[in-house]
Amino acid sequence: MKHNILLVLLFLSGICTLAQNKSVSESPHLFEHDYPVIATENPIIRALMDSVSIDSIEATISHLCSYQNRRCDSRHIYDVQDWLAARYNSLDGLDTVMLHDFKVEKEGFPEETADNILAIQWGLTKPEEYVICGAHYDSWNGDTADPDTVRAPGADDNATGVAGIWETARLLSRYKFHRTIIYCNWCAEEIGLIGSEAYAKECAEKRMDIVGYFNMDMNGYLKEGTDIHMHVVYVNQDSLLANMFFDVCHTYYPDMPVRQNWMPHGDSDFSSFNRSGYPALHPFEDVHASSPYIHTRQDVLGLSVNNLEQSKRFAEINLAAVAHLAGLTDVSVTESEACAVAVYPNPARESVNILAEEGLQQVTIYNLLGQQMETKTLKGKNRCVINTNDYPSGIYLVHLATENGVAMKRLVIE
C-alpha cells in the first residue's frame, strides 16, 4: 500500500498503462457494461478456488521477502522484475508476457525503475474487452538514505497481493474465457501509484475497454480475536462492479463478513483505474486494523503475515471474481498423469466413451453455465458410455473420479 507521503517498451498496440493521493475523484466511466448476477456456485470455478494453495502462497511471499528490499529506487527491484516475468512466462496458458516501461517523475527518485509486468490471456469471443487484476511488487522502508541496503521485506505489503495474482494466473491460465484477462504486477506504487497510473492513463488514451479492475494489496494480517473478513474499498460510481464482487463473496463464502469501507490513510492501485474512467475496487484486510508492521523491517511472515488462510481466501475470491467477469468458455484443463483417462469420440454426437486405466468411481458432466447435466456412479469399471443424443451442441466439462484421483476433460458435442 502506498505510504502516506506520498521490457518490451510500451505495449501500445492494444495493451497500455494512475496513482496519487487518498482523495479519489469519480471520473466518468469510459464504457458502460452490464455485470453478471452471481447467485449460485459454478462448480468449475469452485474447483479452481479449492486448488489455490497455501503452500504456493507462502513460497511466493517467502521468496519475495528474501530480497534485501523491493524499493523501486534500489538495484534489487530489477532482479524481482526478472523473477516475476520468468514465472509468468512459464505458464503455457498465457499468450503474452510484456514489460511495460514508464518514467518516474518524482523529486528525490531516479527517473528509471523496473517495469510493470503484464501477463495476457486473450479472450476467445470478446478479446477487445478486458478484465484486469493486479498487485504492486515494490516494497518500502524509509529508515535509511541508502535504498540498496535498507531492509524492506514487504511480506504483507505487498507480497501477499503478488502471491494472490500469481495463484489466479496459475489456475485460470488453464482455461479459456470470453474476455481478455490481464494479470499485472505494478512497480513504484509505494511512492505514489506511479506504475499503475502510467498504465491506466495509456489505456484510457487508447480507449481500451476495461470492464473491471480488481486490486490485491495487503491481505495477510488478522488482528487477534477476529475472524477472517474483508473490507472492500471503492467509490460509489463503481457500485455495479462491487455488487457483482459482493455476489461472489456471499455465494462462495456466505458466512464471511464483507462490507464497503474506506482507508483512513494511504491508497492503492485501484485508484489509478478509477481516476482514468474505469470501474475498480480494492479488497483489503481491514481498514481499521491492518498490519502495524508495514514499511518496516518487521513486515515479515509470521508477524505481519500471520494468517495465510486469509490470504488464501482473498486469492480464491479474486480468482472467482475474475473468472465470472471474464466469462468461462472453452475449458482446457491438463489432467494429472496419475489419472490416465480418455474421452472419445471428441467431438461427439450421439454418445461418448470414457476409458480409464484405473477404475472409474463417478463421472459428472457440466455445461459451461455450471449446470450438472448427468452423473453416473460406477463401481470401479474401466469404461462407461454416456448417451449424449439429447445434449445441445456446445462445450462441456467431464469431471472424472477414479481410484487414483480426479481428472477433468473438455467434451465438445456437435
Predicted regions and their residues:
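A non-catalytic alpha/beta surface segment that caps or lines the substrate-entry region
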Residues: 56-122
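C-terminal tail/sorting-segment detector
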Residues: 19, 393-414
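Residue-level detector of functionally pivotal "anchor" positions at catalytic/ligand-binding pockets or at interdomain
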Residues: 327-344, 350
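Acidic/histidine-rich catalytic neighborhood of metal-dependent amide-processing enzymes
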Residues: 112-115, 148-237
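Short, surface-exposed loop/turn motifs with a glycine/proline- and acidic-biased composition
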Residues: 377-403
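Active-site-adjacent substrate-binding region
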Residues: 99, 222-330
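N-terminal capping segment at the start of a domain
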Residues: 26-78, 218-221, 290-299
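Short, glycine-anchored, charge-dense loop/turn motifs used at functional sites
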Residues: 366-373, 396
